[in-house]
């Protein structure tokens, strides 16, 4: 489905248009996801590898920039966890203990996956091969 997705993106872009892909990625290519994540967090979700992305865009786009924010994303998720646990008491009347445990588990698991660098948060700037638009990527 990655190739089909990028073909649609290209079709929607103007000739000089650029596309920023913001995605969580993994080191190893896979065609399945964790059953728990599939059921409770991201139904039909999939994290692509760099190889799957580059294979899907070949001939459709050129890569202008590829940045990995993964090492910093651990801190973001830990802030979400802190806020979630801090404010859960005010949410308790709408969400049960199971909900609290599931989201605590998910946030801590996610933070660990970025801390260990098994997951990455990528922003990939793409342009069409014939484009003369030299977009600057700011860091």
Regions found by a protein language model. Give the residues of each.
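Alpha/beta-hydrolase-fold catalytic nucleophile elbow
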Residues: 22
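Substrate-binding/catalytic lobe of Class I Rossmann-like enzymes that use SAM or dcSAM, i.e.
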Residues: 25-134, 138-139
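A short glycine-rich, Lys/Arg-flanked "PGG" loop and its adjoining helix->strand segment in the class I
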Residues: 3-18
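Proteins with a high burden of low-complexity, intrinsically disordered sequence enriched in S/T/G/P/A and R
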Residues: 1-2, 50
């Amino acid at each position: 489905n990655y190739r089909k997705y990028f073909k649609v993106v290209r079709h929607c872009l103007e000739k000089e248009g650029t596309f920023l892909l913001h995605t969580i990625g993994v080191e190893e290519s896979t065609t399945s996801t964790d059953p728990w994540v599939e059921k409770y967090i991201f139904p039909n979700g999939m994290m692509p590898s760099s190889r799957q992305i580059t294979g899907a865009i070949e001939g459709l786009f050129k890569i202008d920039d590829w940045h990995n924010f993964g090492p910093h994303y651990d801190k973001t998720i830990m802030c979400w966890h802190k806020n979630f646990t801090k404010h859960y008491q005010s949410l308790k009347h709408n969400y049960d203990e199971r909900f609290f445990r599931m989201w605590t588990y998910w946030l801590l698991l996610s933070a660990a996956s970025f801390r260990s660098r098994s997951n990455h948060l990528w922003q990939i700037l793409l342009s069409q091969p014939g484009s003369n638009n030299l977009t600057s990527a700011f860091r």
